[in-house]
UniProtKB/Swiss-Prot annotation:
It comes from Lactobacillus johnsonii (strain CNCM I-12250 / La1 / NCC 533). GO terms for cellular component: cytosol. Keywords: Flavoprotein, FMN, NAD, Oxidoreductase. The keyword Transmembrane does not apply. Its EC number is 1.5.1.36. The lineage of its organism: Bacteria, Bacillati, Bacillota, Bacilli, Lactobacillales. This is NADH-dependent flavin reductase subunit 2. It comes from the Bacteria. The keyword Electron transport does not apply. Disruption phenotype: Cells lacking both LJ_0548 and LJ_0549 completely lack the NADH-dependent flavin reductase activity detected in wild-type strain, and show a 40-fold reduction of hydrogen peroxide formation upon exposure to oxygen. Reductase activity and H(2)O(2) production in this mutant can only be restored by in trans complementation of both genes. It catalyses: a reduced flavin + NAD(+) = an oxidized flavin + NADH + 2 H(+). InterPro entries: Flavoprotein-like_sf (IPR029039), FMN_Rdtase-like_dom (IPR005025), NAD(P)H-dep_reductase (IPR050712). GO terms for molecular function: flavin reductase (NADH) activity; FMN binding.
Amino acid sequence: MKLLAIVGTNADFSYNRFLDQFMAKRYKDQAEIEVYEIADLPRFKKEAQPDSKVEEFKNKIREADGVIFATPEYDHGIPSALKSAMEWTGSHAQGNADVMKMKPAMVLGTSYGIQGASRAQEEMREILLSPDQSANVLPGNEVLIGHAADKFDKNTGDLLDQETIHAIDLAFNNFVKFVEQAQK
């Protein structure tokens, strides 16, 4: 199984990058997980033609059996870099339709506060379910990781909190089954 884990920010430092890297390492026996950075994607503009970075991004999604989105929360929503990346996959102006159509998607995230990027995750799910995306999002498979600074080692990126690891294990196993069902 081939999964694409998208780091949902262009920030130099991100606990969500640590989260994607943790998943790629922990579940390497269950799936090939490629961590993908969106930092170099150009800002979406409807009139612009997609450059090679955008084409690479769309092709990575097309080639994956499923996509994992790890998003932080900025001002009760997803970062503008992630929104822009999703606009590249959903815009009909550049023939991008169907990049995410029926693609199994998992959304999770971590934040400094107590709510674990809950509003950003909800916004991301709404985007994925929009008519221009039409992704296949597993309902109820949520992982809200609050107080990221207390749960990750800032220097190594290691996830230290066993309760959080258990929650991710459950959600990831659900997602793997979901992807397998979608492939039938």
